[in-house]
Amino acid sequence: MAVYTDINEIELGAFLRHYDIGTLTSYKGIAEGVENSNYLLHTSSGSFILTLYEKRTNREDLPFFLGLMQHLAKRGLECPQPVVRNDGAMIGQLAGRPAAIVTFLEGMWMRRPTVAHCEAVGEGLAHMHLAGADFPMRRRNGLTLPDWRPLWNLSRKCADTVEQGLVAETEADLDFLEKNWPADLPQGVIHADLFPDNAFFLGDRLSGFIDFYFACTDILAYDVAVCLNAWCFEKDFSYNRTKGAALLRGYTSVRPLSEAEADALPVLARGAAVRFMLTRLYDWLTVPAGSFVVKKDPMEYVRGMRFHRQIESAAEYGLEMQEVAA
């Protein structure tokens, strides 16, 4: 979450007249994240999140994102719910941006996830995949293999200013992934951005997932690979196999991985590291100074790319053979 577009109390008040959520008492911007502008609203009837969708978010995708949240909640998954306007719509206009309000999810994200948190996230992710199996809408992943090289080309000429040799490394990884990306693995709705700041906890109990604005239809095991990257590396960039084993144990306790999915996990994890390095690199080089946004270091995922190159099997991530479907 982040703030790119500022709003004032007068225009916010006019926008809120289209909702039945009580009287506004306070609001503040939320700085974390890189995609859309987000505000925490407090009203006489509770707390809500207001999102203004910035240029990276295609308005045509909003019915997918908001409809998915509704669908998952009906299937028992804890996540924010879109608040319907008085005219029956879920999307309005504020400060020249498409905007929506969703319910506030209780809990907090874990800055230092434990093994228990990793297991809970794995289990929750599998429940999300099963809950989304009958969601009728589809959305192409706009940040998957065919999109990585065009994105890379936007940053390529400046990449070696971030790390000498990064151009050669990234070119080699993209060549490898283009030749080895798996086909015919199970697909469905994936979160695609399930980092620690998108999972809320009350103690060790998972209270729900947020920020579904990268959700799409893609390889289910790729979502697992994203989580291995996001949850199982320590501050010194070392991989924590105990956390990885817990995340995989949690996931496979609900949805066992097929042998093909397990075999593909090292390639998928390497691809996930490249994907997040590329978007971080682009933002690192292009987000203007003074923006109310926390830029994230792409080198974290360069180190992840280097780690995944050495991995030969999912067992090295902590996957046990009994967690693979026969």
From Swiss-Prot:
GO terms for biological process: threonine biosynthetic process. It holds the Pfam family APH. Its EC number is 2.7.1.39. Keywords: Amino-acid biosynthesis, ATP-binding, Kinase, Nucleotide-binding, Threonine biosynthesis, Transferase. It comes from the Bacteria. It is an enzyme of class 2 (transferase). Pathway: Amino-acid biosynthesis; L-threonine biosynthesis; L-threonine from L-aspartate: step 4/5. One of its GO terms (molecular function) is ATP binding. It catalyses: L-homoserine + ATP = O-phospho-L-homoserine + ADP + H(+). The keyword Nucleotide-binding applies. The keyword Nucleotide-binding applies. Belongs to the pseudomonas-type ThrB family. This is Homoserine kinase.
